[in-house]
Every structure is written in C-alpha cells, then in structure tokens.
Amino acid sequence: MFKIKFIDKEHREFFKEKYNSLQGYRKTDVYYLSLIYLLGIDENTRNNFNKIFDIDKGEINIEALHCPWQTSSSEKVTRLAFNLWNSCNYDSREDYFNDKYSSEYNPSNIFCCSYAPYFYEGIKLRFPEYTRTLQNELENE
C-alpha cells in the first residue's frame, strides 16, 4: 500500500481510531478505508461520523447531508464518501425513490475546494488496483 497523506494530526488520529474499530468488525476493505479516510478530512464530518455512517449496519445516512452542522466543504466530503461507498448520487431518500440524481456529486462540484488533494487519497484507497501503476510511476521518476 502507498503512504497515506493526511490533512492534519486530527485526521490521522481519526483514521487510526476508526481503522482499529473496523478491525474488530472485520470490515477493513477498500470501501471502509476510503469512507473513514474521507469522513476524517473535515472536522464537522469527524465530529458527526456516527450521524453519517452506521458501522454496525454498514449503512450511510443520506439525510446527514441536510444537518445544520454541514458546511459546503463538509457536504463535498460527505458526497464523495457516499459516492465511493455505494455509487450514491442522491441527496435524500425521496430523491433515491424518485431516481433523481443530484448534480452536486459531479467532480466539478466536489473537487472545487481545498480538500481536493486529500480527495485523491480517498480515491486511491478505494481503487488501489487502478492507481497503483500511477503511484509506482510517480515514485520512480
């Protein structure tokens, strides 16, 4: 595995804590790793992790996008984590049942923030089989 970059000490500690917790559930696959990494980027998503994701059930909470603690940046973090978790493109349960996709999941909307370099890290965690070659090439230059 490649060396993971963290935005700050709190992000690193959050990731380690959640990873250790997931080991107890035997849930340390790429889906979980990417999700806990991404939700650890922003202080709001770290502090409200249990409102966003239920580790016991392995379920995201789409309605967390509408919580008052969300900021535009934490919404981007949440959307990318949701999309990489299960290809979610919805902003509510109602949208899901009506098959109404949200344009807020488009890369042009998600990546236009200071977290973009860390979003790439989350993608590398989720898709190591596709990003390993690029990582190896960059390291050999």
Language-model segments: which ranges?
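Extended, charge-biased low-complexity segments
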Residues: 1-79, 86-141
